[in-house]
């Protein structure tokens, strides 16, 4: 196999969910050069996988808002040339959207993707040379691995392997990361529940760390810090630095957000609080200790999270 070009551009959780497929491909084709096309904001994540030889950042989100700028079209032209220079034997689009399928079409190599019945945007399947049927009721990780296996001629192993190497610890502190921010209000947990869980974690000797990604989340972090003894607000860090904080945590508790899946990838003890989405399709999966509480239209209390935490082997 000369080379394999993966297209999985976004979002953060989707990028993490693609990593086991990369591991599978490398295991079955160890001599192939693996290249990954990913949205520029998530390029640091793609580079974390040791089997990836090259990352090609794409900037579709930014380009759409700047189509009248000459520099945008120069960037698009340079991106197309970069795609062609990859010279992959197989091009695999696990994103399954029209925009990702158009990227596949611009690349050189045999283009693989989902068939019209297996894809969110059926028109996207028109752009592929080879179309594969993959059940839509499977978890995203399984769908990525299945499509990749069908494209490359193997059946994935039962075990999930994200392929990531844990970054070294810089100190011996024990802390729990609380991911309270998410993309929709319907997926948010009440602050009183975060406070209840945070106070219990403090009583167990864990420092509570509060990340944030926007002004609304920063203000919530301030309120939680004021109510949870010994807690601290995490500085806003680059994505690769945030990864180090997650990978070396003793525990992660979070609502349905992309960063949650990094904890699963690094096998950090994890409690996922789901409120408005189905964890069976996009919830955290991995080989570490994972507990999912709640579910679509199910609201778990902080006592339920404490009960789950008491059963987990917290990292030291």
Model region roles, listed by residue range:
Residues 1-316:
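Catalytic machinery of carbohydrate-active enzymes
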């Amino acid at each position: 196999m000369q080379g394999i070009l993966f297209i999985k551009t976004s979002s953060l959780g989707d990028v993490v969910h693609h990593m086991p497929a990369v591991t599978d491909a490398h295991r079955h084709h160890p001599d192939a050069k693996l290249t990954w096309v990913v949205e520029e904001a998530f390029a640091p994540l793609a580079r974390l996988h040791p089997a990836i030889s090259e990352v090609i950042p794409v900037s579709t989100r930014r380009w759409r808002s700047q189509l009248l700028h000459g520099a945008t079209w120069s960037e698009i032209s340079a991106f197309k040339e970069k795609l062609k220079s990859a010279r992959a034997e197989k091009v695999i689009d696990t994103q399954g959207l029209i925009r990702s399928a158009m990227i596949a079409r611009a690349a050189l190599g045999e283009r693989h993707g989902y068939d019209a019945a297996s894809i969110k945007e059926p028109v996207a399947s028109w752009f592929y040379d080879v179309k594969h049927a993959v059940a839509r009721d499977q978890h995203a990780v399984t769908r990525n691995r299945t499509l990749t296996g069908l494209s490359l001629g193997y059946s994935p192993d039962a075990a999930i392997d994200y392929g990531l190497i844990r970054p070294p610890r810089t100190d011996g502190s024990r802390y729990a990361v609380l991911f309270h921010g998410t993309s929709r209000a319907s997926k948010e947990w009440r602050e009183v529940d975060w406070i209840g869980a945070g106070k219990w974690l403090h009583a167990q000797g864990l420092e509570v760390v509060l990340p944030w990604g926007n002004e609304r989340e920063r203000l919530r972090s301030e309120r939680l810090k004021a109510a949870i003894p010994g807690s601290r607000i995490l500085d806003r860090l680059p994505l690769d630095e945030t990864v180090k904080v997650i990978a070396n945590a003793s525990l992660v508790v979070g609502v349905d957000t992309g960063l949650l899946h990094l904890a699963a990838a690094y096998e950090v003890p994890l409690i996922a609080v789901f409120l408005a989405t189905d964890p069976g399709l996009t919830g955290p999966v991995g080989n570490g200790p994972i507990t999912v509480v709640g579910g679509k239209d199910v609201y778990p209390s902080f006592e339920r999270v404490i009960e789950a935490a008491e059963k987990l082997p917290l990292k030291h």
